[in-house]
Design a protein with these regions (language model features):
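Conserved phosphate-binding/catalytic loop of the ribokinase/pfkB sugar-kinase fold
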Residues: 119-123
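Surface-exposed amphipathic alpha-helical tracts and adjacent flexible/coil segments at the periphery
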Residues: 1-21, 26-33, 37, 49-52, ...
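Glycine-rich, highly charged phosphate/nucleotide-binding loops
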Residues: 43-48
Length: 784
């Protein structure tokens, strides 16, 4: 049985090698451009090739992250960069942008293409189109339950696509690929979709209902994820790869996380994975890094986790060691009474001493003395010791790990040694793994004047086994022919030469060259052909006040959450009939399978009741099966959540839909140029002219905190979320009762002005000008 892949992060070359050594089957890393962790150290092209060769020699793979949105101007630079990485031997490319995906699939037909979680492949009906695009793997959203993962794994397998699941590490409170919080907030220069997320979710906020403050603190900061309790089920489901997050974290973190999951995976396949081992590994992981003192499995159970937030300590929390029992200022010692499951720190490990609210001090352990149920440690300055008192909590913040050289990951080979009359030949063959059956051989003559005794076979085996400083280990040694009298240095020389040759054979086998790209020409252009210019008013929430709908538009767009309520649905249909206007419905850019069934029923009911006034469905489901939408006889428009960022991605996307929003991150002038370049006459461009836009779409409800039966959103339609320092814009939080999710709305920075709309009128396409209206919260009351 082929084992599930363990995929590790690497923020630099040193960590890449550490991850491989520790047992990672594959490593993902980025270069200094075009990746979603651009603030990591990352690798130069030279370092990348060195890392790829190092990994391949040890039967590990390397995936290059190209998981950002890419502009038209950057396209050539990206292609040159990826070409050099593939020439260096990259095994696969992790991609977000659909235009990048198509370009790289064409240029590198033999390189794996992995659809990043940033592509937000959440619905079950997208795998057919992904297969047509040449995708080999989908990185599934972190928000899925075990049942949802299982159904997607089996559907993907029909098309030869495998699935990857995040196993451990930091998580975003927003569904992947849908967060504009960093890109739009404050200066608005740090985009998560462009690799420079400022992590505003880790900051402090206040939540208001009108002028009434409901709660304050780190309201958007989730704990780290850990799926160790679900490991067996994930393997049995058929998941191909378990991914560890952490390209911004240090070598010790990566080494520890890889070793922990390597132990668990091997234990499962060897039949000894049990609760005792799981608890031991969890403790090691908690020491390595956690937020809030524990982990979350998010939604794997199928239920909302109401303990998902990190609490008021959003950084590295540590592992509880015990409490201070006494101090000795003269000796410079702090004595700690150990807790139930203690870990004895080593010299150099950091300890943190805290009261109920804050860290008081931290220090590296110097000397340590163990006693029954206690330890006395040195390392803290006497002046700092004087400020402490018994009863304060002590946490261990890290625990340095060492690894025996014999335990490092290596490639198994079979040695065959042949003694002939005048020479000795050694060949080596890789026994298993991705490099199986690669062979190398070398022959050296026996010195004619050598007069030593014939070599002992055991001595020969010992010398051939001296491979600790290489990427290989001999799993099998065969000796043929009568052993001859020859210097032991000859055997050592053969071993070195053969292993050097086989390593070169392995690394060379991965080098590739790019195919030339085709030069697609768009048929868009300026025209005076018939086209439409319509105005659309979008109302993300009307359930608390249906009177907010005002006349003046051609199309009125409402949330599927509101349209699921018959009273609201009847009201908007009556308004459309009264004003002779049309109705559009926008769907969430992420949803669970249960909501999918509700969506279909609601859309069918709306079509039945509204008839031809039901004009369009707006969603991010670019690659989904469109049969149901077509059957309704309505327009299929794509939302900004699909992240259509360039003219190339727009050109591709228009092949799947009737019209679209470009990404809200696209500069308004650039948006106009892109549209004039590629939009044909039978398509529609939708532009944002006024109002707020979705900054974050989350399966976690910041209003109700995922509490069961909270009933928060039945009373209030919108809440205000404000940063503690008031430096950022006020954000409106709209909770959704059907699935207990939440959308945060904030100001748009790339609104399309009247002048630009006039320029767009020269295009060959229809135009919809959108205005979004949300409640304005003032002075303790909600004003519409």
């Amino acid at each position: 049985m082929e084992k599930i892949e363990l995929l590790a992060p690497a923020g630099n070359l040193r960590i890449l090698k550490a991850a491989v050594d520790s047992g990672a089957d594959a490593v993902y890393c980025g270069l200094t451009v075009f990746n979603a962790r651009i603030n990591a150290e990352n690798l130069t092209l030279g370092q990348f090739e060195e890392g790829v060769d190092y990994a391949h020699a040890r039967s590990s793979r390397v995936y290059l992250t190209v998981n950002t949105l890419v502009s038209d101007m950057e396209r050539d630079d990206l292609f040159d960069t990826v070409s050099k990485a593939c020439e260096a031997g990259a095994d696969g490319l992790i991609v977000q942008d659909i235009a990048v995906l198509k370009m790289l699939r064409e240029a590198f037909p033999d390189v794996r293409i992995n659809a990043s979680t940033q592509m937000n492949i959440y619905s079950r009906d997208q795998f057919k189109e992904l297969f047509k695009l040449g995708v080999n793997r989908v990185v599934l959203p972190r928000e899925l339950s075990m049942d949802e993962i299982s159904s997607r794994v089996h559907l993907a397998a029909r098309y030869g696509i495998d699935c990857e699941v995040f196993a451990h590490g930091a998580v975003c409170v927003c569904a992947s690929g849908l967060c504009l919080f960093s890109a739009m907030n404050k200066a608005g220069t740090r985009s998560g979709n462009r690799g420079t997320c400022a992590q505003p979710c880790r900051e402090e906020y206040k939540l208001y209902n009108g002028g009434l403050r409901l709660r304050a603190g780190h309201l958007l900061s989730p704990k780290d994820r850990d799926v160790s309790d679900y490991l067996a089920r994930l393997i049995e489901t058929g998941v191909a790869s378990l991914k560890l997050e952490g390209r911004m974290r240090d070598e010790n973190y990566v080494r520890s996380a890889v070793r922990a999951y390597r132990t668990l995976i091997d234990a499962y396949y060897d039949g000894y994975l049990d609760d005792t081992l799981l608890n031991e590994i969890k403790r090691d992981l908690l020491i390595n890094f956690n937020r809030g003192g524990s982990y979350t499995a998010q939604y794997l159970s199928g239920r909302k986790d109401d303990n998902i937030l990190s609490g008021e300590y959003p950084g590295k929390y540590g592992y509880s060691l015990g409490k201070i029992s006494r101090m000795d200022v003269k000796k410079g010692t702090v004595t700690i009474s150990l807790g139930k499951h203690p870990v004895i720190p080593s010299k150099g490990d950091y300890l943190s001493i805290r009261n109920d609210k804050n860290e008081l001090c931290s220090f590296p352990v110097g000397k340590l003395h163990e006693m029954p149920h206690e330890i006395a440690v040195k390392g803290l300055h006497p002046d700092a010791i004087q400020k402490l008192k018994p009863g304060l909590s002590v946490f261990i913040m890290n625990h340095a790990t060492e690894q025996d050289r014999a335990e490092l990951r290596r490639t198994p080979v079979r040695f065959n040694l042949y003694f002939n009359d005048t020479d000795v030949t050694l060949d080596a063959t890789v026994i298993s793994g991705p490099n199986a059956d690669i062979t190398a051989a070398a022959t050296l003559e026996i010195p004619s004047d050598y007069e030593g005794a014939p070599l002992d076979e055991e001595r020969i085996r010992t010398q051939l086994s001296k491979t600790l400083d290489t990427a290989f280990y001999p799993d099998e040694i065969n000796i043929y022919g009568e052993t001859k009298s020859c210097p032991i240095s000859l055997i050592n020389g053969l071993r070195r030469e053969v292993l050097s040759s086989i390593e070169k054979e392995i690394t060379t086998s991965y080098k590739r060259t790019a195919r030339p790209l085709s030069d697609d020409v768009s048929d868009a252009g300026l025209t005076t052909a018939d086209k439409t210019k319509l105005t659309m008013f979008t109302y993300p929430v009307i359930r608390q006040n249906m009177d907010i709908i005002s006349e003046g538009a051609d199309i009125y767009c409402y949330s599927i959450y509101d349209m699921a309520v018959k009273e609201l649905r009847d009201h908007v249909i009556a308004f459309a009939e009264k004003t002779d206007t049309k109705i559009a419905v926008f769907l969430p850019d992420f949803s669970h399978d249960l909501l999918e069934k509700i969506i279909d029923k609601v859309l069918a009911s709306l079509k039945s009741d509204a008839g031809e006034r039901f004009y369009a469905v707006i969603s991010s489901r670019l690659l989904s099966d469109k049969a149901f939408i077509k059957g309704l006889g309505v327009k299929d428009f794509i939302s900004a959540g699909a992240n259509i960022y360039s003219s190339k991605s727009a050109e591709i996307a228009l092949g799947y839909c009737d019209g679209l929003f470009m990404s809200h991150e696209v500069d308004a002038d650039e948006l106009v140029n892109n549209a004039l370049d590629v939009f044909p006459a039978d398509k529609t461009l939708i532009v944002q002219s006024e109002g707020m836009i979705p900054w974050m779409q989350s399966d976690f409800c910041v209003c109700g905190q995922n509490k069961k039966h909270c009933d928060t959103c039945s009373k209030v339609g919108v809440f205000e979320l404000q940063q503690k320092d008031r430096m950022g814009a006020s954000v409106l939080a709209v909770p959704h009762s059907i699935d207990c999710s939440c959308t945060l709305y904030g100001p748009a920075k790339n609104l399309v002005t009247e002048d630009l709309i006039s320029t767009l009128s020269y295009g060959n396409f229809s135009l919809i000008i959108n205005h979004t209206y949300l409640p304005e919260v003032k002075d303790g009351e909600t004003v519409y």
